[in-house]
């Protein structure tokens, strides 16, 4: 059975040690910088565990990388990946975000079944209000921007690496059954009802866009995450 495939895109402007630290922090794996594919990476939550292959690539000029990625030669990769984690550090964060948004809209088939994370690797973080507005606009694409250097706050939702892990945790790995952990044993569970899941997700997106109050929107998202998690497990 094939492993799930996740593409990680890193800017060449990051130091090698930052590449290693990023991947090791998210995936709890000792990453060898000479690897372009890290196979058989275990992802475990309270409810399930699965196995990932990490496809690791770098870019100098993002648009040039995108031009290659949308070519016919890369169609198979575009089709099989379960998600993309895109790291960027540009002081003007809007052009790279727009570039990836257009990629998702125009060239990723069935993007609602995949996850897309933009990790802003810059200590001058995107301000909370702007980040909220940005992610509201990207919700339809299953694309979320996360500040890597956001400071955790007990009163806030998860941020930084913990938020990235949370997004991966609740992703519905739809291509094959997962392993559910129960007590000391393990049992197999069937794939979720994809139609019901996607209908609920689309309804949630439409409702989310009607909120004007950020706190109400955050509470709604927490509720939906719990409900979708229940559907997965």
UniProtKB/Swiss-Prot annotation:
InterPro entries registered for this protein in UniProt: Irc6
Gene name per UniProt: IRC6
Domain of life of the native organism: Eukaryota
Entry's Gene Ontology molecular function annotations: protein-macromolecule adaptor activity
Alphabetical GO biological process terms: vesicle-mediated transport
Family to which this protein belongs: Belongs to the IRC6 family.
Keywords: Chromosomal rearrangement
Disulfide linkage: none
Job of this protein: Involved in gross chromosomal rearrangements (GCRs) and telomere healing.
Name of the protein: Increased recombination centers protein 6
């Amino acid at each position: 059975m094939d492993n799930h495939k996740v593409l990680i895109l890193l800017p060449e402007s990051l130091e090698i040690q930052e590449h290693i630290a990023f991947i090791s922090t998210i995936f709890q794996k000792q990453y060898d910088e000479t690897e372009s594919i890290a196979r058989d990476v275990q992802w475990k939550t309270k409810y399930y565990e699965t196995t990932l292959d990490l496809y690791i690539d770098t870019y100098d000029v993002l648009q040039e990388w995108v031009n290659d990625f949308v070519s016919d030669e890369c169609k198979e990769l575009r089709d099989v990946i379960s998600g993309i984690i895109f790291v960027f550090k540009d002081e003007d964060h809007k052009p790279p975000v727009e570039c990836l948004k257009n990629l998702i809209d125009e060239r990723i088939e069935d993007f609602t079944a995949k996850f897309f994370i933009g990790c802003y690797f810059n200590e001058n973080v995107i301000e909370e209000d702007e980040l909220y507005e940005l992610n509201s606009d990207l919700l339809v694409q299953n694309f979320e921007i996360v500040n890597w250097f956001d400071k955790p706050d007990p009163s806030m939702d998860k941020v930084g690496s913990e938020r990235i892990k949370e997004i991966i945790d609740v992703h519905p790995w739809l291509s094959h059954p997962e392993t559910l952990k129960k007590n000391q044993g393990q049992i197999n569970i069937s794939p979720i009802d994809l139609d019901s899941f996607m209908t609920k997700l689309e309804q949630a997106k439409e409702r989310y866009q009607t909120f004007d109050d950020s706190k109400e929107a955050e509470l709604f998202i927490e509720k939906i995450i719990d409900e979708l998690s229940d559907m997965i497990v």
